[in-house]
A protein has these predicted regions:
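Residues forming well-ordered secondary-structure scaffolds
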Residues: 12, 16-20, 37, 93, ...
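Active-site glycine/GP-rich loop and adjacent strand/helix microenvironment
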Residues: 66-399
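Conserved AMP-binding loop of ANL adenylate-forming enzymes
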Residues: 21-73, 85
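Short, solvent-exposed loop/turn and secondary-structure capping segments
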Residues: 6-7, 55, 122
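Conserved AMP-binding A3 loop
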Residues: 1-22, 29-32
Length: 399
């Protein structure tokens, strides 16, 4: 859980991150020529600097904070909140300040991590007393999102923002570089950005962790295969494993989806469950039961009192299912449909018992993240883990 320190050069800011932001806007406008995006302001939700790490002539902090700190003065004219507010470290204070500063502004677009942005927008609704966001910001039309999968949050955003003119675009802007943009709103895949100062290589996930894995150059990748992404950049990274797993959906042009994290998976019994499986399973269970998931995490139970093994899921709902058992059954069924390894281990309950679903109390994950000093910014709830460390902490708080 320690911070990672990634070099961010001025050239990298200009030729990678800001260029990616410009291209995201350009692609959106190309797809929506009647857009009035520039009639109002952009609410950009970022992280903060970390003054405890500062040394002479250097600034350490979340990438999003560094981007705000160094943003072009012209772009700064159309951005809210003010810089002092944007860089506040205390997320609860920042959330309240942002809501109060922006409620009376003409916001046309928002950018940030879906989970933390939802928290800010919820505060806006509380302070305004309105039912839907377009009652506060009637001209809102776009959410540029990234950092975590949008699927678990989509329904909540659609309920919060009823406007038929609302659009969503996924971006892949990591601390290490700006890697992808969703250039086609009808396709969830992102276009790999080849000219942002990065060189891409991939390690097949079935070889990841070996001493000498195969490293595939970009021109050698295959579609529908899970890879760990390896990058070298003009900012100083050399064959760096960024920690995300991707699957290419096309190689002409190169388009991909993020399927998970190299450390966030469950393979305690050979089931090879990845985050993409989890997202699909939860989406299906929500569809079947009318539920909405806010946060979740899962880990294996290696052996219970009866000598049985299973997966244990801790789920916080923004809208609870009518029947929790049916939700768990639907999730388990869908995981077997999309993951043959999981299906094999679940066969006749020989290796894996049906999954156990535990309902989290409201606000549990936010309280846990706050306790760990990980509230807001670019911090993410770990979704899947072979270790029970995180889920045990959460279960203790959930009593």
């Amino acid at each position: 859980d320690k911070s990672k320190f990634i070099p961010v050069s001025r050239q990298g800011l200009k030729d990678t991150h800001y260029r990616g932001g410009q291209d995201a806007v350009a692609m959106y406008l190309a797809n929506n020529p009647k857009s009035r995006l520039f009639d109002g302001k952009a609410l950009i939700l970022g992280g903060s600097h970390s003054p405890n790490y500062n040394v002479a002539n250097s600034i350490v902090g979340d990438l999003s904070a560094i981007l705000i700190e160094n943003i072009n003065p012209l772009a700064n004219l159309v951005r809210v909140p003010k810089k002092q507010t944007a860089l506040i470290s205390d997320f609860e204070l920042k959330r309240d300040r942002i809501a109060r500063e922006t409620m009376d502004k003409n916001i046309t677009n928002i950018s940030g991590v879906p989970s933390w942005m939802l928290s800010v927008l919820t505060r806006v609704m509380e302070l305004s007393g309105k039912n839907h966001l377009e009652e506060v910001w009637p001209n809102i039309e776009m959410f540029f999102h990234g950092g975590v999968a949008f699927t678990p949050y989509r329904k909540q955003y659609e309920q919060l923002i009823k406007s038929p003119n609302m659009h969503y675009m996924e971006t892949y802007n990591a601390s290490e570089g700006f890697f992808g943009l969703q250039n086609d709103p009808t396709d969830k895949s992102m276009l790999l950005m080849l000219d942002y100062g990065g060189f891409y290589e991939c390690i097949p996930m079935d070889e990841f962790g070996r001493e000498n894995p195969t490293v595939v150059p970009l021109w050698g990748v295959e579609t529908n295969k899970n890879y760990a992404m390896v990058i070298s950049t003009s900012s100083g990274l050399w064959r760096y494993i960024i920690g995300d797993t991707v699957m290419f959906t096309s190689v002409n042009p190169y388009k991909f989806v993020i399927t998970g994290r190299t450390k966030h998976f469950i393979n305690a019994f050979g089931e090879e469950l990845i985050v993409d499986n989890a997202e699909q399973g939860l989406a299906y269970a929500c569809q079947q039961t009318g539920a909405q998931v806010l946060e979740y995490t899962a880990a294996p139970v290696f052996m219970n009192d009866e000598g049985k093994c299973r997966h244990q899921w801790l789920v916080e709902f923004s809208k609870e299912p009518d029947n929790l058992a049916l939700f768990a059954e639907a999730l388990d069924r869908r995981l077997q449909e999309i993951n043959s390894d999981y299906e094999a281990k679940r066969y006749k309950n020989i290796t894996l018992q049906p999954l156990e679903l535990i309902k989290a109390q409201p606000g549990l994950f936010e309280m846990w993240m706050k306790k760990r000093g990980k509230l807001g910014g670019q911090n993410k709830v770990p979704r899947l883990s072979n270790s029970r460390e995180h889920i045990e902490q959460l279960l203790e708080m959930n009593k």
